[in-house]
Amino acid sequence: MIFSSSLLENAVNEFAKLPGIGKKTALRLVLHLIKQDNAEVTQFSDIIAKMRNEIKFCSRCHNISDAALCNICSNPMRKQEMLCVVENIRDVIAIESTQQFNGIYHVLGGIISPLDGIGPEQLTIDALVERVPKEEIEEIIFALSPTIQGDTTIYYISKKLSAHRAPAGPGGQDHPVKITTIARGIAFGGELEYADEMTLAKSISNRIPVENFIISGN
């Protein structure tokens, strides 16, 4: 692609760095911005800068948030005892779009993938294990992409939850934790965020029990 302006070329190259944006799409976006008046372009750039500088991650679930707690964790109408474990923030948005889940989330920040150099220590698995007894979670729903890496992550976390349990101490109370995974309505190897809302909704409604654990209460 040959450009008559280095300013145009630089802008196109920056847009093309975004996921899923090729040079041709980047060019269309930049040319669209050129046609807009200064106020609209300034507003666009200000919104991007404000988002980048002020956006936070929820201290509880690691979802995107405007405050210390996201609007899902801080919502008293959500089922606080039902925890959905997802790979990334895009999966939270996909599941919320189905309007079939009214619990809370835990964002792992990825899945275990040794070939990509991603191990348990790079994810928020330890924080998840700590949340389960502390928040008296009754059901954990794994909503990970149906891949070998996703299944490996489910297996690892399930074993870690089992190993983490401890006999109830004085005043402690054991409670059963139901572990489920979404049904395989999504093709193996596919990614959760690309599933249509109806398929994803059915996968959540028809989730499959994995195993029951007894996690010691505090």
Each language-model region and where it sits:
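Short Gly/Thr/Asp-enriched flexible loops that form oxyanion-binding sites at enzyme active sites
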Residues: 149-162
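Conserved phosphate-handling catalytic cores of large alpha/beta enzymes
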Residues: 176-184, 191-217
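Cys/His-rich Zn2+-binding cysteine-cluster or related metal-binding knuckle/ribbon modules and their
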Residues: 2-9, 30-92
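Extended interfacial segments that mediate partner engagement and assembly in macromolecular machines
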Residues: 26, 75-144
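Conserved phosphate/pyrophosphate-binding and hydrolysis machinery centered on Walker-type P-loop NTPases
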Residues: 19, 38, 51, 63, ...
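A structural micro-motif
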Residues: 103, 174-177
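Short Gly/Ser/Thr- and charged-rich N-terminal loops/segments
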Residues: 165-173
